[in-house]
Amino acid sequence: MTQSHLILPMMLVIPLIGAALIFMIKPGASGHRARGLGVLAFCFALIPALMGVVLLTRFNYAAGSVWQQRFNYPWLPQFHVNFSFGVDAISLWLLMLTLLVTPMAILDAVNKIQHRQNEFYAWMLISYACMIGVFISHDVLLFYLFFEFSLIPTFFILGIWGHSDRRKAAVKFFLYAFAGSVLLLASLIYLALVHQEKFGTFSFALADLYRAGQALSPTQQGIVFLGLLIGFAIKVPLFPVHTWMPLAITESPTPGSVMIALVKLGAYGLLRFAIPMLPLAAVRFTPFLAVLCVISILYGGLISWVQRDMKKLIAYSVLSHLGLCILALLALTMTGLTGCVLVMLSSGLLAAAMLMVMGMIYRRYHTRNLLEISGLARRLPVLGFFAVFFFMGTAALPGLIGFISEIISLVGTYVSGSAGHGGYLGPAYAIPAALGMILGALYMLYWVAHVIFGPLVETVPDADTSSTHAPAVVQDLSVREWLVLLPLALAVLFLGLYPAPVLNSLQPAIGKIRHEVLAAVQENATSRMAVNTHRVGAVHSAGKPGLVAPLESQGLGKAVALRLPVRLAR
């Protein structure tokens, strides 16, 4: 085992060590000690990020479909469960997103958490480790454990350090997540049992569960896919199982809101597991899911128009963009699948950045009501600039990552089903999705015009009373806040102007998943066609030409044989 193979488990272990160490340090009454805990947590979060830079230099981008930097250590060998880690191009870029944003979220929290600071930073680091574990896991059971353990720190961060309605938000979040977890675990265990029955070993290895899922009949695939779908759709979230997210984002402290909006675990689970494992069911459910995606896009955009709470505005914007993400995934074109991953990256970056900007505004104005904030560019020009920058990124301004991700996703959906592209959607889904994105851009422009460039508001609500007062001194960005926002802005700009490294590295990994899905669908169609042809031939050879000849004379014999495959392809 070479040293390079240890980089992924080290990324996972270092935040956990930091969490254990910080948890044992009592914050005390001194503000300096609390600040020191935040800085220490930031350092433990920064180390894996620096290791991520090393990983970027060692990754073979031409072989993006190959799991690289593999680490494998037996855990439960009798069940073929291992500590198996690795990254391909898809998981690499989502891992980089996590490694960039989480340290910034922790740094943003320094001096802002007023009680039980050691516990807060410990939970943030545990959440960080869980997200890293999700994206580097090559064993499906290991993925599931990290996927579900990520709920625990989010629950405590929301329930302890959230706002006035935090307990309701935490309970609702937990109930939704727990319901999805049960279905998800049952589906994965069933696939492992199928692999034991058909291939002789009980295994949670990724390749083995792919093989087990694809060996199921279309009906069996549909039942298992439904369990995976509900589990992952709750975490996306997708309409109509989205209602936990706006409340959770609104009631969480800013770092907790960032972690909720950042992670794209549900979308990643659908892309990595549900669709390639159960391709026949995925194709069968595609029209239904695509309609839900379009509803998510339009619903999120329309609800955002009437929002006055800054955090709720961002939450419904995230819902709209994730609807586009899953729609592009369902298109099953190379362009659409690439757009799906790009939307995960852009939504994570932009939503996290906007939430941090909104948190900085809240700390100065003590309100989240957008109608009570205006003229930000005059009083806080630097913060106003970053607010405009990230708002415009979300509105898909050309040159920023939001634009390239939305365009690629919409084009991939539009050409889906046309000659030479494959897929099962088309303009009927792409056009309303595009209208939803335009709607989103319009409400972002509206709030930029009002909040940033509107008339200067001199009175703001007091944090503790119902009266209003003119804030004595409203300072622009501090050095720490510059350090939080600048890396995110540079990433949004760089990926918008030069997305080629991401796009090129994704092609092999995306192509591999797409090939597995379409090959399984084609194989099923071919086998069903052969069965139907055999049945027609058997009827003819049995001396009953009257049942066949009229069909052949009308040119319909082939259509009867191909009826199921044609319906499936559509």
Residue ranges and their predicted role:
Residues 67-76, 200-212, 412, 416-421, ...:
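Membrane-interfacial helical/loop segments at transmembrane boundaries in membrane proteins
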Residues 104-112, 129-141, 155-449:
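Hydrophobic transmembrane alpha-helices and their helix-loop junctions in integral membrane proteins
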